[in-house]
Curated annotation (Swiss-Prot):
Upper classification of the organism: Eukaryota, Metazoa, Chordata, Craniata, Vertebrata
Tissues of expression: Expressed specifically in placenta. Expressed in both trophoblast giant cells and spongiotrophoblast cells.
Gene: Prl4a1
Cellular component GO terms, alphabetical: extracellular region
Secretion signal, residue range per the UniProt entry: 1-31
Protein name: Prolactin-4A1
InterPro entries: 4_helix_cytokine-like_core, Somatotropin/Prolactin, Somatotropin_CS
């Protein structure tokens, strides 16, 4: 009887040992990553990353809603998509995809995300006011524009928290052309004015999408270590 039970007990023992070793390895890996990042509370650090990504996703969702609204009510049939657009952040040379971003050092990529958001502080300050004045946007649409402005500011602050907790140094890259489209947004010529809004939404959507991609990739590289 003892002999017949030995294989069963042996298999359970092996399984328990495997599970125990897996948990031990995960805890050790987390501790090693926390030590490497000089992070005392690794869980809180991860939660801050999640908060940043959620803010970025919410911001992208609102930008998409504003962009779609503008296309439907103001840009249809004007051929704006055939015109050349140029963004004031183009000189930052942002990676366009995950493969390019993987080649960038962690601190540099985090600093780039911060720089992109910082570059939009002034344009977003004017966006909702000009949408009200020049487009006659309704309060629900204006509230979304104001929400994008707030989300951008909150995301900047969250990235700064990440840098502080992770002992990163954000080197602010101000190597971008100052935004100078306000006069075009206020142009008395309707086609000029509408194209300026089209260009703004195009660039804002592109840069904001890049920020979300960078944050997800950085979290993966720092916390999951399997990208």
């Amino acid at each position: 009887m003892h002999l017949s039970l030995t294989p069963q007990w042996s298999s359970w023992t092996v399984l328990l040992l495997l599970v125990s070793n897996l948990l031990l390895w995960e805890n050790t890996a987390s501790a090693m990553r926390a030590k490497r990042l000089n992070v005392h509370d690794y869980t809180t650090f991860g939660n801050t990353w999640n908060q940043a990504i959620q803010l970025s996703q919410s911001m992208n969702h609102r930008i998409s809603e504003l962009s779609t609204h503008f296309k439907v009510f103001y840009a249809q049939g004007r051929g704006f998509e055939k015109r050349t657009t140029r963004c004031h952040t183009s000189s930052l040379s942002s990676p366009e995809n995950k493969e390019q971003a993987q080649k960038i050092q962690l601190e540099v990529l985090l600093g780039l995300a911060h720089s992109l958001l910082q570059a939009w502080v002034n344009p977003l300050y004017h966006l909702w006011a000009e949408m009200c004045e020049r487009l006659g946007s309704t309060p629900p649409i204006l509230s979304k524009a104001l929400e994008v402005k707030t989300l951008n500011r909150n995301l900047l602050e969250t990235i700064e928290k990440i840098a502080f907790k992770g002992n990163f140094e954000i080197n602010e890259n101000g190597n971008y052309t100052a935004w100078s489209e306000l006069e075009l947004l206020q142009s008395p010529n309707r086609d000029t004015r509408y194209f300026a809004f089209h260009n703004l939404f195009h660039c804002l959507k592109k840069d904001s999408s890049h920020v979300e991609m960078y944050l997800k990739l950085l979290k993966c590289r720092l916390i999951q270590s399997n990208c």
